[in-house]
A protein has these predicted regions:
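RNase H-like, metal-dependent nuclease domains and their acidic two-metal-ion catalytic environment used
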Residues: 1-160, 182-183
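Conserved beta-strand -> loop -> alpha-helix junction used to position metal-binding or nucleic-acid-contacting
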Residues: 150-178
Length: 183
């Protein structure tokens, strides 16, 4: 009995569905083709998923490299305790989502964190920043505004969610990953 088969059905987000490739912050290929053929396995990047999980590079890239059609940064401010502020920069082109930057910042709501977020937004040419409303009722976004005005004026929106974080992550990523559109 191969128990890994049941594990694959139990967990909706699969590492194998990702497309792994170097990403330019300004341009991307018009079309990226995914394949889980053995010749596309990336062997020099450690995969820490289940047994049998692998990272795959694109099977093919078609068309010219063209500018992204949109960009967004999502910020999940650190809560109480020792967690970090999570930041993810995503760009869009032809139905694909390209993660150009993803990191965690220690330091809570300090000026250095707010400045770093603003500079990352500038480096990634972000159009819109979505900030998850935690317990402060929009306080983090208000603290971020003056730094954005100084380093990278862009649209800033508070996002309020009622679902648990894990379910939101799965609901957002599963359709994108299953169709091999997260790069």
């Amino acid at each position: 009995l191969d128990t890994t088969l049941s594990d694959q059905d139990r967990y909706p987000l699969k590492i194998n569905d990702l497309v792994i490739m170097p990403i330019n912050k300004e341009f991307a290929p018009e079309k990226v083709i995914w394949s889980n053929s053995p010749e596309y396995v990336i062997t020099d990047l450690q995969c820490v998923g289940f047994n049998g999980d692998r990272f795959y590079r694109p099977a093919q890239q078609f068309g010219d490299f063209i500018e992204y059609t949109g960009s967004v940064m999502f910020v999940d401010p650190s809560g109480k305790g020792k967690d970090q502020t999570a930041i993810s920069c995503v760009k869009m082109l032809n139905g694909n989502l390209y993660v150009t930057e993803c990191l965690g910042l220690s330091g809570g709501y300090s000026d250095s964190v707010l400045e770093k977020i603003s500079k990352i937004a500038r480096e990634n040419q972000i159009n819109t920043i979505l900030v998850e409303q935690n317990f402060g009722g929009g306080m983090f976004a208000e603290l971020l505004k003056p730094f954005l005005m100084r380093f990278h004026p862009c649209q800033l929106e508070d996002v309020r969610n009622n679902k648990t974080k894990e379910l939101r992550i799965i609901d957002t990523l599963e359709p994108v990953m299953n169709s091999h559109r997260l790069i």
